Amino acid sequence: MIINEIEIETPFGLMNTFITRPDENGPFPVVLFLMDAPGKREELHDMASRVATSGYYVMLPNLYYRRTRNFVFEPTPLGREKMLAQMASLTNDLAVQDCQELIKYADADPYTNKGPVGCVGYCMSGPFAISAASALPNRIKAAASIHGVNLLTDKDDSPHRKANQITAEIYFAMAEKDKWADPTMVRALDEHLKSVGTNFRIEWYADTDHGFVFPNRGAFYDKPAAEKHFERILSLFDRNIKRTTT
């Protein structure tokens, strides 16, 4: 595997980004791997690398780059307060702009195939992935939200509002015990996406809680469910961004 830490020049500053890909048999389809609230870290590097081993050029950006290059979450009340402040600095529109910058960079790299792009967002980035799919329908052809939050809200930028523009296949992995994504919201999301003709699947992961895919999340980590999520997203990418370019 090839691993690089690079800085992408954007109109908003330098976006430090972890990039990983196989060392043979390229060029590769691009996958945007969007972090959860605790930020870009080694745990996510490992997860992104897991995806890359299946034949993808995976980009994991620090979405907090406008405020800090290296955010380190501390599991204390003050640490949580700092994390929430970082989260509040982001919007769906800003995340879409970042995805555009990532794709622009990837298109200039000879190891990418310049074809359909995949995107996966975790927790706070679930809506970012869906928003990117609606804003960039000509490029993003597969998107996944893993225990995502704020997928359907009353705000003007709620990701469901432009779902009719999505051309990608969408996958939602929902944690059964997730207090941040209650069943009422998910049912409303399901009904709305059906009404606009989105190609999607919502899957509930039984007896799991928010953050179940992360190995360092202690009791919240559910290895069988985490492995299933990898199976689902890799299958999603295979159908939509790999097979169409080989």
Question: Predicted regions span which residues?
Answer:
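N-terminal cap/leader regions of alpha/beta-hydrolase-fold enzymes
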Residues: M1-T246
